[in-house]
Amino acid sequence: MTNIRKTHPLLKIINSSFVDLPAPSSLSSWWNFGSLLGVCLAVQILTGLFLAMHYTSDTATAFNSVTHICRDVNYGWVLRYLHANGASMFFICLYLHVGRGLYYGSYMYSETWNIGILLLFAVMATAFMGYVLPWGQMSFWGATVITNLLSAIPYIGTDLVQWIWGGFSVDKATLTRFFAFHFLFPFIVAALVMVHLLFLHETGSNNPTGIPSDSDMIPFHPYYTIKDILGFLIMLTALSALVLFSPDLLGDPDNYMPANPLNTPPHIKPEWYFLFAYAILRSIPNKLGGVLALVLSILVLAIVPMLHTSKQRSMMFRPLSQCLFWFLVAILLTLTWIGGQPVEXPYVIIGQTASVLYFLTILVFMPLVSIMENHLLKW
């Protein structure tokens, strides 16, 4: 008798995705982050669901409801900090996942790559709206500053901002709709993840060499299921340590003060995972220019496949491109540091230099170095 997992209409989909899926035999730990992101999403949806049972999206009670969760709800503090630090873990895994894609040429699967960029935007939007919900000082002012950027759009900007706010400032209407969207978006993300995997399974996984691996495939289960479970354990241990030992390490102390529209915090800044984009935004003195640079800092990933000039797919055997890749990582770390600093010298000029180098590296240096490597290999 044929195994039920191969004949049952539902089980055979799961079987062909997670059990009998042929996978390259040489996948390194950098291929673990996809499954880790799945775990992060599950953790966020579950903790978020339980938090939503106790949270109230009203300006008068939002801050107090979060305090109530932490003080009065059984293990509410664990839920709250798992959710807040789970977002940080989510973005760490996201950035490493994207970095892996850039390094090993996974962007050549353009459909999977483009859905991934869409996912990145969706997760960023979700995280931004979630940060507004506790209704602390940084929640309120972060929402005011970032939504206000849309007013830079010519002609419709001001109307658009007021439409998003639901009034003439960030207020009750804004908080209520942000809660509604913050609840909805993770499910849209989950649907997009399905599409992401659908397109990935059309082509099969890439591998570290960038060479087609059809001649050397192994079943996903047990090899990669065990490997993924080890990844889960390591990540969940790190997340637990963060939640139980220093839950506020990555947060902003200003958010423990209730939102006050009459008192601006000395330094308005987003969560750490948006600081690189915030630094790029601030490095351009013009409002519209800054907004465009902010969007392009992520959207530039969409044109990376068009800029692939190398005869090889992966950077595994391209030392010059590897140097540029790590240079790009250093630039992003520099931008993250600058995003958290006040707008004064020398930070302004460092941020502007790093922003220019970020775009130059992706758009100019990498394609040129790839062409140079082709010539060095006499290809």
Swiss-Prot record:
Gene Ontology MF terms in the entry = metal ion binding; ubiquinol-cytochrome-c reductase activity
Q: What biological-process terms (Gene Ontology) are attached?
A: mitochondrial electron transport, ubiquinol to cytochrome c
Record: residues binding heme b b562:
H83, H182
The transmembrane residues are 33-53, 77-98, 113-133, 178-198, 226-246, 288-308, 320-340, 347-367
Q: Which cofactor does it need?
A: heme b
User: According to its record, how does it sit in the membrane?
Assistant: Multi-pass membrane protein
Query: Where do the annotations place heme b b566 binding?
Result: H97, H196
**Where along the chain is a ubiquinone bound?**
H201
- What are the GO cellular component annotations? mitochondrial inner membrane; respiratory chain complex III
Mutation effect (M235K)? In strain: Isolate TK 18667
Q: What does this protein do?
A: Component of the ubiquinol-cytochrome c reductase complex (complex III or cytochrome b-c1 complex) that is part of the mitochondrial respiratory chain. The b-c1 complex mediates electron transfer from ubiquinol to cytochrome c. Contributes to the generation of a proton gradient across the mitochondrial membrane that is then used for ATP synthesis.
Q: What else is known?
A: Heme 1 (or BL or b562) is low-potential and absorbs at about 562 nm, and heme 2 (or BH or b566) is high-potential and absorbs at about 566 nm.
Query: What family classification does the UniProt entry report for this protein?
Result: Belongs to the cytochrome b family.
Q: What is this protein called?
A: Cytochrome b
Which organism does this sequence originate in? Glossophaga longirostris (Miller's long-tongued bat)
Tell me the organism's taxonomic lineage. Answer: Eukaryota, Metazoa, Chordata, Craniata, Vertebrata
